[in-house]
Amino acid sequence: MMPNYLQDLFKSQSYDANNFFLIAGPCVVENEDIVMEIGEKVSTLCKKLGIPYVFKASYRKANRTSANSFTGIGDDTGMELIKKVGAKFQVPTTSDIHAHEEAAIAAAYIDILQIPAFLCRQTDLLIAAAQTGKIVNVKKGQFLSGASMKFAVDKIKLAGNEKIMLTERGNTFGYQDLVVDYRNIPAMAENGVPVIMDCTHSLQQPNQTSGVTGGNPQLIETIAKAAIATGAHGLFIETHPNPAQAKSDGANMLPLDKLAPLLEKLVKLRKAVI
């Protein structure tokens, strides 16, 4: 059953309570036109399919491989546009924070504070996010087991916040690949919190000598289906009208026009496994 804090989060949406929820959007805020186009199309699609929806976008990418890579259009502008998408389409929003000083600022604009995988053990960051009272979604580090995420959960709870989600995004497999261990989904669910599968970042091919992370987006459907089958409560999918032109993580993104057929299959699968 969906916890009360998620029921409250999705109270403005009409959805099937037995469905998975979706966190989807571009990697980073590029401009107003892109975020509005994605927000409109995904929210309309999710309403049609009865899927609770959260719009996502980073207002700043603080962990790009190369110093020359695009990081954003400015924090204030990025957060304002994320908030504008949420207000226009009546959907909750999420973005990632990278330092404890950002937590209270981002919380004024965003409904769910996301902790990046590389920072999931940073106690000060977890506590600052928790103290905002917002839902905190912690991405499991590529270097951790699902079972070890209990310590991140404990830190947030000790700060007085029970509104927690955990996200699986794969584990390092050699120098330039990731692999998903689906045992991590039930392992993280043992903490009594919703578990999300990041279907795009789990297909990254990091540490490329070009300075640009590669990907394997043709396997997004496979990752998503397996996640639904193993009990994931939600899915995280980055999408873009033209991934080849995206300013960040284009190699991992699902083309926006391919989202509808994918979600239709996943809704059917969800009904078969619950």
Question: What are the residue ranges of the model-derived segments?
Answer:
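Active-site-adjacent loop and "lid" segments of alpha/beta metabolic enzymes
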Residues: 67-76, 112-119, 175-182, 203-228, ...
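Catalytic alpha/beta core domains of metabolic enzymes, predominantly
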Residues: 133, 137-239
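Alpha-helix-loop-beta-strand connector modules within alpha/beta enzyme cores
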Residues: 41-49, 68-94, 129-135, 185-195, ...
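Structural preference for beta-strand elements that scaffold enzyme active sites
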Residues: 19-23, 52-56, 90-94, 111-112, ...
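Glycine-rich, proline-tolerant flexible connector loops at the mouths of alpha/beta enzymes
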Residues: 22, 26-35, 54-75, 239-249
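A cross-domain feature marking catalytic cores of carbohydrate-active enzymes
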Residues: 26, 55-59, 95-97, 117, ...
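Catalytic beta/alpha-barrel core
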Residues: 73-74, 88-102, 111-124, 135-146, ...
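N-terminal amphipathic alpha-helix/helix-capping segment at the start of soluble metabolic enzymes
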Residues: 1-22, 271-274
